[in-house]
Swiss-Prot record:
The keyword Chloroplast does not apply. GO terms for molecular function: melanocyte-stimulating hormone receptor activity. GO terms for cellular component: plasma membrane. Keywords: Cell membrane, G-protein coupled receptor, Glycoprotein, Lipoprotein, Membrane, Palmitate, Receptor, Transducer, Transmembrane, Transmembrane helix. Interacts with MGRN1, but does not undergo MGRN1-mediated ubiquitination; this interaction competes with GNAS-binding and thus inhibits agonist-induced cAMP production. Interacts with OPN3; the interaction results in a decrease in MC1R-mediated cAMP signaling and ultimately a decrease in melanin production in melanocytes. InterPro entries: GPCR_Rhodpsn (IPR000276), GPCR_Rhodpsn_7TM (IPR017452), Melcrt_ACTH_rcpt (IPR001671), MSH_rcpt (IPR000761). This is Melanocyte-stimulating hormone receptor. Receptor for MSH (alpha, beta and gamma) and ACTH. The activity of this receptor is mediated by G proteins which activate adenylate cyclase. Mediates melanogenesis, the production of eumelanin (black/brown) and phaeomelanin (red/yellow), via regulation of cAMP signaling in melanocytes.
Amino acid sequence: MPVQGSQRRLLGSLNSTPTATPHLGLAANQTGARCLEVSIPDGLFLSLGLVSLVENVLVVTAIAKNRNLHSPMYCFICCLALSDLLVSGSNMLETAVILLLEAGALAARAAVVQQLDNVIDVITCSSMLASLCFLGAIAVDRYISIFYALRYHSIVTLPRARRAVAAIWVASVLFSMLFIAYYDHAAVLLCLVVFFLAMLVLMAVLYIHMLARARQHAQGIARLHKRQCPAHQGFGLKGAATLTILLGIFFLCWGPFFLHLTLIVLCPQHPTCSCIFKNFNLFLALIICNAIIDPLIYAFRSQELRRTLKEVLLCSW
């Protein structure tokens, strides 16, 4: 994605020399100040992308294969896996092309590299936006299934889910093209940050409300069976821990990237902000880590999906 200091990585590699051995240490910024820079080895970057790619391909394959998983909930999970797959795949492709250009194994004109960079930017940006949208869609779907359980199947139908999926993908592609075309405008970057915060607030509000309802339900069952208080207190602690992990992972993996965008608007020339800008590849790696974790949280916990996955893997052998 086009952002300060990193918006033309492919073009920069045409005339660059191979980078030094990746490290974690102090680097000097433009003002001479010392700052912490975490360099991500290309091998690690590609490895993370490959793990994410394999995981999410397995999720998409399992859902496509099992007709029992052709429901609105799994439709959103499948699209989340697809968007995470594209995030990882596009970053892997960009890294691989950069390495080939730097090694002289790939010869290309600047115009060709520019077009390739634009295509990768659109794929990366649109898939990132789609991933955030589908995380929100999954939260909304689960909320409706709990608070409108009796009407769930009439509210969330497969045709409506498909229309929502189509709308998310179309909007993600259109807005990503708009963002990339006007990436140097502060308003565009702020819109992205506001969108991230809106998704974070939406997920937090919905999941906290669901946790409160689950605790009320557990307390009702405890009173019905005349259980001791520690039983439902333990449930509440477990639910709170699960919620903290879910939202914590989301914030830790996505937050630094959007902090990066915010600082581009607020302090593009400040020495401290310049130090943070140097860690852009680390922020991308965290997003890929989120793409690795998403299947573990949303997909692999399903017994039906795990069973289908075993069948797929056994058949492949």
